[in-house]
């Protein structure tokens, strides 16, 4: 049976929205300030939704999240800077204080409205600065796919 968990103190990615986490299993260690969710994990915050096999959250002393790490078939639908994205990777890390995402191993990021696609071994995205960085593993190159509208000559 799936365990529905709404974490009371688990608010803000800077915007004071409630985070809801659904998983098969939940583990917390208050001394280490860590929570671990395993099995069919779904994290929802506003319109953003993350699914993965496992999500680990590290908290500060005020019980605010410092870092989210999603592993195992991690997929995310999110809005960043008024753009809608889908991302997938073996591991995803989100730093809410810096508004930074890191997608690691078989990383893919798709901007839905403009149909831009980025593939790489590691994708770094900063919401605050609008900076994107993509790295390869040396075996496969980074790939960026986008459409160009050709203007017709009269």
Q: What kind of feature is each model-predicted range?
A:
Residues 1-154:
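Mature-chain termini and adjacent capping regions
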């Amino acid at each position: 049976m799936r365990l529905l968990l709404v974490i009371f103190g688990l608010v803000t990615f800077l915007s004071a929205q409630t985070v809801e986490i659904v998983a098969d299993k939940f583990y917390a260690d208050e001394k280490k300030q860590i929570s671990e969710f395993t099995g069919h994990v779904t994290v929802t915050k506003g319109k953003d939704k993350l699914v993965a096999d496992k999500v680990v959250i590290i908290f500060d002393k005020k019980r605010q999240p410092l870092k989210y790490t999603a592993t195992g078939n991690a997929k995310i639908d999110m809005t960043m800077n008024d753009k809608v994205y889908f991302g997938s990777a073996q591991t995803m890390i989100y730093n809410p204080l810096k508004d930074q995402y890191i997608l690691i191993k078989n990383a893919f990021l798709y901007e839905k409205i403009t149909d831009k696609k980025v593939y790489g071994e590691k994708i770094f995205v900063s919401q605050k600065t609008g900076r994107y960085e993509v790295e390869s593993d040396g075996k496969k190159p980074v790939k960026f796919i986008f459409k160009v509208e050709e203007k017709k000559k009269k």
